[in-house]
């Protein structure tokens, strides 16, 4: 993305404040963390040994002087296109190892302890180049396992205007397994999700092969019929990617891709629950139909997140505006993309639907962990990674005070002031 020259200084300043740029994280020995359990607000003591939760004990009260912070598993974001001035798949942004570090450290500050860098429809050579960088960084010690794999949103999506969103028509293609395998190898076999349009030629065979390799298939940016959607789910598609987005502005009232994806109980959905991507009514209806057990809250966030409000030029050459309240839009007022971190979606779905904090955390942590087979995280249980967040709910906003990744305190709001 083409962004203002001061962004580089802004990002550097972030990490001087956060203090991680050159720090090596290593968690050895035993430690204890106190907080109010997110499920029932009861005081707890969590014991950690070498980054793993070894004990969870309810307490009558928190120790004297301990702040009353809610404790929950770290958030897991399955669709991060970029963050804090870093883009994972933009033709006018060079992705570097330091860029991946910077984005990860910034996400930690927002309570995200695990995320899938997302590569959208683009030049295959750019995708390969960026996957090489990401695959190399995936296992870097200082990132503490925060990147378990990647999400490919395309290029196997609908070429029809509206359904393809901002994706370049030039690079959209039908699913071809041999070409995907080449990309898969560049990722060091770490692609965890592919989002595709099931109506494309060869899609069902492709879904079968993804399932055989443990790659989650999402349905998105498509205009498939109810029959095709049902067939795709039968073949192994598991989630509707950012439901309600990737639709044409004008769709038939009764015959469109939305209803069959909502009505199929076999299909999970992900929702972008910022205040701009979906209406409150959409969020309420989607939640009431699918429930907390079949929903993933995602951010679909872009590299504009955390940048100063102002006017920017998108990779497509459009003038866009990041407003004071965090809306990322075209100058005509239409939403361009998301610039809100996942924690904002957690707070917003609670505000809009009346769901509990426990339900919101399930959708933003537990469910994505289960979806991708990340059995070591997503809940607070003995034997799991100590990926934890401590926070306050202030006027329906989620204020992160501390973030632990594998038992390491990687963000502390007090020490960052």
Language-model segments: what does each one mean?
Residues 13-24:
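Bacterial N-terminal signal peptides
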Residues 259-269, 287-299, 305-391:
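His/Asp/Glu-enriched, well-ordered alpha-helical/loop segment
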Residues 380-417:
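C-terminal cap of metal-dependent C-N hydrolases
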Residues 2, 6, 11, 25-61, ...:
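N-terminal metal-binding scaffold of metallo-dependent hydrolase/deaminase domains
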Residues 81-84, 89, 101-133, 145-158, ...:
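Divalent metal-dependent hydrolysis catalytic cores, especially in the metallo-beta-lactamase
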Residues 177, 181, 185-309:
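Active-site core of metal-dependent hydrolases
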Residues 158-188:
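Conserved phosphate-binding/catalytic loop of the ribokinase/pfkB sugar-kinase fold
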């Amino acid at each position: 993305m083409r962004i203002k020259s001061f962004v580089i200084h802004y990002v550097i300043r972030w990490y001087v404040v956060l203090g991680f740029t050159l720090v090596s994280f290593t968690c050895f020995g035993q430690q204890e963390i106190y907080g109010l359990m997110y499920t029932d607000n009861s005081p707890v003591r969590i014991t950690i040994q070498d980054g793993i939760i070894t004990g969870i004990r309810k307490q009558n009260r928190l120790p004297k002087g301990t702040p009353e912070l809610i404790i929950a598993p770290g958030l897991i974001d399955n669709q991060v296109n970029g963050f804090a001035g870093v883009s994972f798949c933009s033709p006018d942004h060079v992705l570097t190892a330091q860029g991946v570090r910077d984005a990860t450290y910034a996400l930690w500050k927002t309570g995200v302890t695990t995320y899938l860098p997302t590569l959208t429809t683009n030049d295959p050579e750019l995708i390969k180049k960026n996957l090489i960088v990401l695959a190399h960084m995936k296992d870097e010690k200082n990132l503490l396992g925060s990147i378990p794999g990647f999400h490919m949103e395309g290029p196997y999506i609908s070429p029809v205007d509206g359904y393809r969103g901002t994706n370049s028509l030039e690079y959209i293609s039908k699913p071809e397994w041999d070409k995907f395998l080449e990309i898969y190898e560049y990722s060091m076999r770490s692609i965890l999700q592919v989002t595709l349009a099931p109506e494309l030629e060869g899609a069902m065979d492709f879904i079968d092969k993804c399932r055989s390799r443990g790659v989650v298939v999402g349905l998105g940016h498509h205009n498939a019929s109810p029959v095709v959607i049902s067939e795709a789910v039968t073949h192994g598609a598991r989630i509707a990617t950012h439901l309600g987005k990737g639709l044409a502005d004008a769709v038939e009232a009764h015959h469109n891709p939305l209803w069959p994806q909502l009505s199929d109980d076999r299909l999970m959905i992900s929702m972008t629950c910022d205040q701009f991507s979906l209406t409150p009514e959409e969020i309420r209806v989607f939640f009431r139909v699918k429930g907390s057990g079949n929903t993933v809250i995602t951010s679909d966030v872009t590299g504009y997140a955390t940048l100063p409000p102002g006017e920017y030029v998108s990779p497509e050459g459009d003038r866009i505006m990041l407003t004071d309240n965090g809306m990322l839009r075209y100058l005509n007022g239409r939403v361009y993309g998301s610039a809100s971190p996942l924690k904002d979606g957690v707070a917003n779905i609670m505000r809009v639907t009346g769901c509990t904090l426990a339900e919101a955390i399930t959708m933003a942590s537990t469910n994505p962990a289960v979806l991708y087979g990340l059995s070591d995280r997503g809940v607070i249980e003995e034997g799991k990674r100590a990926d934890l967040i401590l926070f306050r709910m202030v006027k329906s906003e989620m204020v992160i005070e501390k973030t632990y990744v594998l038992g390491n305190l990687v963000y502390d709001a007090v020490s960052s002031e």
